[in-house]
């Protein structure tokens, strides 16, 4: 059954499940999820059952007797895994260009200034573009917040954003209690045990339709598909070398501003976001090791995983998400500022040791997984002016394949950690709370007259190095609470109430 909702979005009813589908310029989206362009409903609604997916690993790779760890210096420029035309084009690091922006935002902080690659410099553009057509489009879609503009970054924005990775943060958490929280979350994901690696040739098929190739590849190609067309054998060899236990070359990530539609008042306040895309070889290695796990999580029932990553319509989408909060009396929401930059290496190590590593069947697989996982601990951070930095504490880079999954998992862990710190049992967490996480966003419901302290939860974030800032600090009514900036609107459809998101804030769908 297909018909239009009042917003113009298609409402598709299958076996009593109602799903809102928005078709925009850049593809098809279900609620907040963007899927690749497609004309087949079977592709849009594709989801696999994973209950029977857990199977014993068949070892198709030759075991390696001795594993080597990454040993290259962060202060050298290794281009051995890049094409010869790029190697000939670039020289090694020269003296770091310590200009006004670098001194203003990085001096005295935990950032090592490595050097400069003059060949990657490009001229910064302006700071603000107001597009009249987009303003009109917003007005036509009943967005009443005023004028909008397209954000365009500059060096000031870039260095200000880099500063967050160099800022020391509070870390006085109870490690034993945090590990206990990770193990609690791990139990909910036992279905991941025995998940096999993805063969290299399948990896290249999966990522072919993705966009920026990241890192130094942007000097040669504009999309991952172009890199694969020209240099697939190099990428294939890169993955096979990893499977043979060879050291992973030092990785270079590149910082760039993100052009997007934002409220004019936010742009004028300097709220312009940046991205740090990882190079295509990193996407390949992580997809090879963790790709199947990420697929399983994305297609699993979010009432078990507590994660809206992928948000498979197989489990009912937004309507089912809202119904999962039926019977709860108090609600809270969080949205942690600059979340990615505060996911430091020590937290990631705990996550690998007590979560990811437990799902690999053989020591060989676990070692390969650790080599890939830790390859992003010590990266070279390339800025648009050619300067290269190193942040000893690490961080989360926006283009990491694991970002959505692991950030959501860490958010879940921090909630459980806060519950344990307040003396709540595992049974209380399972039976008297309901949560949903998507990256840094969280929405939680509590049953009955709970004594759960929101301030204590926020202090748990602070202890683990996540500054809370202006996060909401009180209980809310059911339809006042939001998730990923979306609030819920109950609507009648075919004689019953259907919960849909109020999507006037979903500006990305307008472009």
Language model features with spans:
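Active-site scaffold segments
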Residues: 19-20, 30-34
């Amino acid at each position: 059954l297909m018909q239009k909702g009042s917003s113009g979005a298609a409402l598709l009813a299958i076996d009593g499940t109602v799903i809102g589908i928005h078709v925009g310029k850049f593809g098809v989206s279900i609620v907040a999820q963007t899927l690749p362009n497609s004309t087949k409903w079977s592709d849009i609604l594709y989801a696999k059952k994973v209950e029977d997916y857990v199977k014993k690993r068949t070892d198709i790779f030759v075991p390696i007797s001795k594993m080597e760890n990454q040993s290259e210096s962060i202060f050298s420029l290794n281009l051995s895994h890049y094409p010869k035309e790029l190697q000939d084009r670039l020289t090694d690091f020269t003296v770091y260009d310590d200009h006004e922006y670098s001194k203003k935002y990085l001096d005295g902080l935990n950032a090592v200034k490595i050097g400069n690659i003059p060949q990657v410099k490009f001229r910064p553009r302006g700071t603000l573009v107001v597009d009249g057509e987009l303003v009109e489009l917003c007005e036509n879609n009943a967005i009443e917040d005023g004028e909008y503009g397209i954000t365009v970054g500059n060096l000031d924005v870039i260095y200000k954003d880099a500063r967050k990775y160099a800022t020391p943060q509070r870390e006085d958490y109870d490690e034993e209690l945090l590990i206990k929280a990770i193990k609690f979350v791990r139990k909910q994901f036992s279905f991941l045990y025995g998940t096999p690696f993805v063969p290299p040739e399948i990896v290249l098929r999966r990522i072919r339709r993705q966009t920026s190739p990241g890192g130094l590849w942007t000097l040669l190609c504009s999309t991952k598909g172009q890199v694969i067309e020209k240099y697939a054998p190099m990428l294939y060899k890169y993955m096979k070398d990893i499977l043979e236990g060879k050291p992973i070359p030092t990785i270079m990530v590149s910082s760039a501003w993100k052009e997007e539609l934002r409220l004019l008042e936010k742009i004028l306040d300097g709220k312009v976001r940046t991205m740090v895309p990882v190079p295509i070889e990193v996407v390949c290695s992580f997809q090879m090791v963790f790709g199947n796990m990420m697929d399983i999580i994305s297609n699993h029932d979010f009432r078990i995983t507590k994660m809206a990553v992928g948000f498979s319509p197989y489990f009912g989408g937004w309507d089912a998400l809202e119904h999962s909060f039926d019977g709860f009396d108090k609600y809270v929401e969080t949205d942690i500022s600059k979340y990615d930059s505060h996911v430091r290496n020590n937290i990631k190590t705990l996550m690998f040791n007590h979560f990811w590593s437990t799902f690999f069947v053989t020591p060989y697989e676990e070692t390969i997984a650790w080599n890939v996982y830790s390859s992003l601990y010590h990266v070279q951070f390339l800025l648009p002016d050619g300067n290269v930095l190193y942040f000893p504490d690490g961080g989360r880079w926006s283009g990491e394949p694991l970002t959505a999954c692991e950030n959501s998992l860490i958010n879940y862990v921090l909630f459980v950690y806060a519950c344990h710190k307040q003396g709540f049992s595992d049974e209380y967490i399972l039976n008297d709370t309901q949560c949903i996480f998507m990256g840094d966003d969280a929405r939680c419901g509590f049953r009955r007259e709970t004594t759960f302290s929101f301030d204590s939860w926020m202090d748990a974030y602070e202890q683990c190095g996540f500054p809370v800032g202006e996060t909401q600090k009180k209980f809310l009514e059911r339809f006042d609470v939001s998730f990923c900036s979306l609030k819920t609107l109950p609507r009648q459809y075919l004689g019953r109430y259907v919960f849909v998101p109020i999507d006037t804030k979903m500006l990305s769908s307008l472009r």
